[in-house]
Design a protein with these regions (language model features):
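Short hydrophobic/aromatic beta-strand micro-patches
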Residues: 254-256
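DPxDG-like acidic metal-binding loop motif
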Residues: 97-123, 139-141
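Short, well-structured alpha-helical segments that form the helix of a local strand-helix-strand
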Residues: 122-133, 214, 264-267
Length: 287
């Protein structure tokens, strides 16, 4: 029996770093949004042990696989041995992009396992299992539009992002997240997101108000070799975006558009220089 789940990417409509905690993690306050750019995860009980196949290639099993770690944590939580599992991963979301693609894949696997082996499991327990593997994962369990606090594990559902189109553009390089956090720890951002104002705009279904408040404090700490991010932001604005921002620790930049025609034209224009450019829509809650 095969079970399949979509793994939507996420963007950060707002991202604020409040400080470094004594446990080594950072205290964050973010508005997160699922988008329709997604991978597909299929799980079947077959084979021997745990096998992960990504786009036809077998990923070596082992503790380094977040998918295997999550599966082991799931079956430990439900109190039964892990059966032989084969996980098929069809990738669309780019890796190391600030879009939470890896976390979304792991959580899609957990949702598959919950459907098959523990449909009565509370969503809160699934989030707790995800948190043992990564800080992004509690949000990925339910998705939609949410305020995320703490490491990202304290979630408050928010009114949905008004209907719009989102263009995502990833340059060829990646940005190491730990290095960016280190730079942020050493400085103080000049601008912080107006998250309360963004929540009011979401409640009022005010797309312009949401767009006006897009803000990611990581942008202020980008080393010069990554300043192509700002070129992409400016290009999105020239192409008609209401506003644009970097997602997560980057390097993907997204722009919000009211009309599909303008968004599609922007996608086409950016794709000439940046093959990893995508057109997406907001996605509501998953569970």
């Amino acid at each position: 029996m095969k079970i399949q789940e979509q793994a939507p990417a996420k963007i950060n409509l707002a991202l604020n770093i409040l400080g470094r905690r004594t446990d080594g993690y950072h205290e964050l306050r973010m508005v997160m949004q699922s988008v329709s750019l997604c991978d597909t995860v299929t799980v079947e009980e077959t084979g021997i042990g745990f096998a992960l196949l990504a786009d036809g290639f077998t990923v070596p099993a082992g503790k380094s696989s977040l998918e295997q770690q999550a599966a082991e944590a799931f079956f430990a939580a439900v109190g039964r041995p892990m059966p032989p599992l084969t996980v098929h991963l069809e990738k669309t979301t780019p890796a190391y992009a600030g879009l939470g693609g890896g976390s979304a894949d792991v959580v899609a696997l957990l949702r598959c396992l919950r459907r098959r082996y523990a449909p009565e499991m509370p969503v809160e327990q699934l989030r707790a299992i995800g948190l043992t593997v990564g800080s992004d994962m509690p949000f990925c369990v339910s998705g939609g539009t949410a305020l995320a606090e703490g490491r990202g594990e304290r979630l408050t559902a928010l009114p949905a992002l008004p209907d719009c189109w989102i263009v995502l553009c990833k340059p060829e390089f990646g940005i190491p997240t730990p290095a960016l956090f280190t730079l942020a720890d050493a400085g103080t951002p000049k601008n912080r997101p107006d998250i309360d104002g963004m929540i009011r705009a979401l409640s009022a279904e005010d797309l312009n108000g949401v767009a006006a408040r897009l803000c990611n404090v990581f942008e202020e700490f980008l080393p010069e070799e990554y300043h192509e991010v700002f070129h992409i932001k400016n290009r999105l604005l020239e192409l008609g975006a209401l506003n644009a921002a970097m997602s997560g620790s980057g390097p993907t930049v997204f722009g919000i558009f009211r009309e599909k025609t303008a968004a599609k034209a922007a996608e086409t224009a950016l794709k000439q220089c940046y093959p990893q450019t995508y057109l997406a829509k907001p996605v509501g809650e998953l569970v």
